[in-house]
Amino acid sequence: MSGARRDGVLVAKARAARLRAWAPYSGFRVGAAVRAGRRTFTGANVENASYGLTICAERAAVVAAVLAGARDLGAVAVASDTVPPTPPCGACLQTLAEFAGPGLPVTLSGGRGSRVETTLGELLPRAFRSLPPERRRG
């Protein structure tokens, strides 16, 4: 499968995950899909009345990947309905940086067909890292 087609599939999975979001307070629904090897893992934001306990879609997808034994992320897609598309928050970017390098492709998909292609390094140029890559394999 070509890179463009693979990224299209990743975006479609993120958009499908967005439909499963629980966002009764803000109405802001986000879905995410991460690729690790040949597998894809999805997540959606899950709000809580205590906003600080809300789980972001990107972190939910990363947690699903880690629970399945994945440690090296190859790409991520984030879907919202905003124009322009909404990037991951700082906590999500730092979580992605725990399992990927700055070259991680990040596709942001928004409303009215809007789309942004970027990298983790462009979104978080100075990620905090304390573990060397060989220790991150778990």
Region locations from a protein language model:
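C-terminal binding/interaction regions
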Residues: S2-R20, A70-G138
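Stable alpha-helical structural segments in soluble proteins, enriched in small hydrophobic residues
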Residues: A14-A17, A57, A61
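Short Gly/Pro-enriched turn/cap motifs at secondary-structure boundaries
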Residues: W22-Y25
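Short beta-strand scaffold segments in enzyme catalytic cores
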Residues: G27-G37
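Short acidic-glycine loop/turn motifs at beta-strand connectors
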Residues: A36-R39, G110-R112
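Glycine/charged-rich beta-loop-alpha catalytic/anionic-binding loops adjacent to active sites
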Residues: G37-N48, D72-V76
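Compact, glycine-rich, soluble single-domain proteins
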Residues: N45-A60
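Alpha-helix C-terminal capping segments
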Residues: A64-G69
